[in-house]
Regions:
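Long, low-complexity, acidic Ser/Pro- and Gly-enriched intrinsically disordered regions
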Residues: 1-92
Length: 92
């Protein structure tokens, strides 16, 4: 397994076990896809991490740059992230 493959396997395991520190550690070694970055943002919310808001805003920037979404989609995604900050323990 390549170093990146190993890091991705660790990232996946960390998400499954809701291990924030391990997920962050593995993510530093990867170029996360938009989907995986969102999974990390949700883990921040679940753990009520003070990093949640900044991570959510950075994810929104990537979403806008990489997806070319319609305005309605941007509004829905933004509202969903804002709600997510106040919900804890729900599955990703």
């Amino acid at each position: 397994m390549t170093a990146e493959g190993h890091a991705y396997a660790r990232f996946q395991r960390a998400l499954e076990h809701r291990a924030l520190w391990a997920a962050e550690d593995a993510a530093r070694e990867l170029q996360l896809s938009l989907h995986d970055a969102l999974r990390l943002v949700h883990l921040y919310a679940d753990r009520r991490s003070p990093k949640f808001e900044r991570a959510a805003l950075r994810w929104l920037e990537r979403y806008l740059a990489e997806s070319s979404p319609r305005l309605q989609s941007v509004a829905e995604v933004t509202a969903s992230l804002a709600r997510r900050e106040h919900e804890a323990g729900e599955p990703i």
